[in-house]
Amino acid sequence: IPIIRPLNSSLTADEIDEITGILNGTTNYMLSKMFYEGADYDTVLKEAQANGYAERNPEADVEGYDACRKIAILSSLISGQQVDFEDIYCEGITKITVEDMKYAKAMGTTIKLLASSRRYAGNRLHAIVAPCMLYPEHPLYNVNDVFNAIFVHGNVLGDCLLYTSDAA
């Protein structure tokens, strides 16, 4: 998603206080298949690899490390301070089961791997990467398949959603 240039140029007068996104198309593809088709993790991983979405060693994607590195970069940009990805809590999708997806559906939610960074008073920052349950009202709820999206909130911008496919 082309977000770095806007953060460095178009949005420099804006104080960005939140960036939340689906930053990895591979994991979003896998979770979409699990949710809509009822497929299990191992099956969708093999399918993602066969389609060229997942690497032979998918650890960086499925453990959330790729999304974690990306949110660390974005966190650094919005805060003006160095954010090390190793300081961010990171949980991937390897423990998500078919049963989890059934419960999410029963509750009227879906499960997405979100990377989120939020600024608080005093330029304090909180960032996390983890599977989250989203209700249909959430702007990232309908981002499926290999698509990525970033929700940005700023004091001048308000809410903005950037959306693209990016898993190949």
What are these regions (language model features)?
Residues 163-168:
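Conserved small/polar residues in nucleotide/adenosyl-binding loops
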Residues 151-162:
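An anion-binding loop in the catalytic cleft
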Residues 21-24, 130, 153:
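Short beta-strand segments
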Residues 44-142, 147-149:
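Substrate-binding/catalytic subdomain of NAD(P)-dependent oxidoreductase enzymes
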Residues 2-54, 65-66:
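Rossmann-like NAD(P)H-binding beta-loop-alpha module
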